[in-house]
Amino acid sequence: MNKINYISFFLLITLGNLNAQNLAVLQYEGGGDWYSNPTALKNLIQFCNAEINTKMNLEPQRVSADDPEIFEYPMLHMTGHGNVFFNKETLQNLRTYLLGGGFLHIDDNYGMKPFILPQIKNLFPNIELTEVPLNHPIYNIH
């Protein structure tokens, strides 16, 4: 079993056995509508609870990208259209969150990609982004 499979297995077992977890929608600056698609995360939570037996609370919270409260959530959901901006403090907060094991799920409703990619590059300037192929094990949970 490779490292990704071990990590995925550990996460599935751990998340499945924890008490209910809160997830949050990430509020960000820049004028993009971070609040769009309000049912997306709720639908994802319902799917995960039903299909992989997680115990996530059905009502997601909302947290600002610069707020230390992001560390209270194992996963942040980011969505919207258009501009995204992270200032220096926000970048540091998100970087610390991600390096500490937090997960950021970015749902590009449409039109977000040209704005979010430079911000991701600012988060991790020394790391080259690569696309995960569709046949990667992470896409197969059953």
Give a label for each model feature.
Residues 39-43, 47, 89, 93, ...:
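Extracytoplasmic/secreted proteins, especially bacterial periplasmic and envelope-associated proteins
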Residues 66-67, 87, 136:
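Polar helix-capping/helix-linker motif
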Residues 55-63, 106-109, 127-134:
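Surface-exposed patches in mature extracellular/periplasmic domains of secreted proteins
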Residues 23, 75-114:
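Short alpha-beta junction capping motif
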Residues 4-15:
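Sec-dependent N-terminal signal peptides
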Residues 47-55, 79, 96-100, 119-126:
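Structured segments of extracytoplasmic/periplasmic soluble domains
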Residues 21-22, 27-31, 39-40, 113-142:
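An acidic, glycine-rich "communication" segment
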Residues 19-75, 79-82:
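Aromatic-Pro/Gly-enriched surface loop or interdomain linker
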